[in-house]
Amino acid sequence: MKKFQSPFSEFTSNALTLITGTTLAQVIPVAISPILTRLYSPEDYGVFALFVSIVAILSAFASGKYELAIMLPRRERDAANILGLTFVLAMVSSAISLGVLAIFNESISQVLGNEKIAKWLYVVPGAVFLNCVFLSFSYWENRQKRYKRLALNRVVQSGFTASSNLGIGLGGYGWGLILSSLFGQSVATT
């Protein structure tokens, strides 16, 4: 006798996999936040928040949001071409933003009202590129229905970010928040 299979069982399983991964990835930083608030100053968090905001805004434009289109094509080849396009656009945008930031670094940091961000503005283009690649691969993995891998990537990113935040913070380096964020995302992207 055939076992009754709900048409939603695969969907439910995939959704639960993603929900579990996302939940674990969010629990990790919440769990260590009491420690991190003692290792990093409010000023360190301010510079980090400003850095993340700049990267998020530039990332929204860098790839032209073409990563959203990776899911749409019927043919795998077309989706792969869109994936490649997002990489090229992100690379070109990052190179242009590096030039702009190199020329106007001091002016930008003055407009932002934070002199400490000036040295981190040079890192922004690389972070934008990394963010675009990470998002593009996430959509690609979603298209390939690799939900366990997506969930694992989120947990790995969160875990590596948290552990490097702790390690660098214990060393007394305020820049650890930014570096750890980049480290966690680069590990999850590979």
Language-model features: locations:
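N-terminal membrane topogenesis motif
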Residues: M1-I28, N81-G84, V88, I117, ...
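Membrane-interface junctions at transmembrane-helix termini in multi-pass inner-membrane proteins
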Residues: T12, A69-D78, F129-V156, G167, ...
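Alpha-helical transmembrane segments and their helix-entry boundary regions
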Residues: N14, L18, Y45-G46, A69, ...
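Small-residue-rich midsections of specific transmembrane alpha-helices
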Residues: I19-T22, I28-I32, G46-R74, F87-A90, ...
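Alpha-helical transmembrane segments of multipass membrane proteins
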Residues: V30-I35, S136-W140, A162-G167
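Helix-loop interface residues and adjacent transmembrane-helix termini in multi-pass membrane transporters
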Residues: L39-P42, V111-N114, R143-Q144, L170-G172
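Short membrane-interface helical motifs at transmembrane helix boundaries
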Residues: I96-N114
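Hydrophobic alpha-helical transmembrane segments
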Residues: A118-P125, A151-T190
